[in-house]
C-alpha cells in the first residue's frame, strides 16, 4: 500500500506543478485543507474516496489515472 500512496502522491504533485498550482490553490479548488494535499503528495496518508474525487476534479484527471497511472481516452 505504501507504494500505491507514494505513486498517487507523485501523480498529484506532478499534475499540480504542470498546472502551475500551489498546494493552497489545489486545496481551495478541491475543498480540502492544504495539509490534506501535503500528506497525499508525500504518500503519508490515504485519502478518503470523496477526497480522491474532489482532487481529481480539481486537477482535471481521472480517478483511474490517479490510482493506477492509466490514461484513458474520452
Question: How should these model regions be labeled?
Answer:
Residues 15, 29, 40, 69:
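Residues in the recognition helix of alpha-helical DNA-binding motifs
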Residues 17, 28, 57:
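Alpha-helical residues within the helix-turn-helix
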Residues 50-65:
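DNA major-groove recognition helix of helix-turn-helix/homeodomain DNA-binding modules
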Residues 1-18:
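A short, Lys/Arg-rich alpha-helix, primarily the initiator
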Residues 20-39:
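Short alpha-helical DNA-recognition segment
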Residues 57, 67-74:
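Short, charged recognition helix plus adjacent turn
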Amino acid at each position: 500500500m505504501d507504494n500505491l500512496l507514494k505513486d498517487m502522491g507523485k501523480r498529484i504533485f506532478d499534475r499540480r506543478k504542470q498546472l502551475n498550482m500551489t498546494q493552497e490553490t489545489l486545496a481551495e479548488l478541491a475543498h480540502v485543507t492544504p495539509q490534506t494535499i501535503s500528506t497525499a503528495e508525500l504518500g503519508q496518508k490515504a485519502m478518503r474516496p470523496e477526497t480522491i474525487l474532489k482532487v481529481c476534479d480539481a486537477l482535471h484527471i481521472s480517478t483511474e489515472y490517479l490510482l493506477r497511472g492509466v490514461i484513458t481516452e474520452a
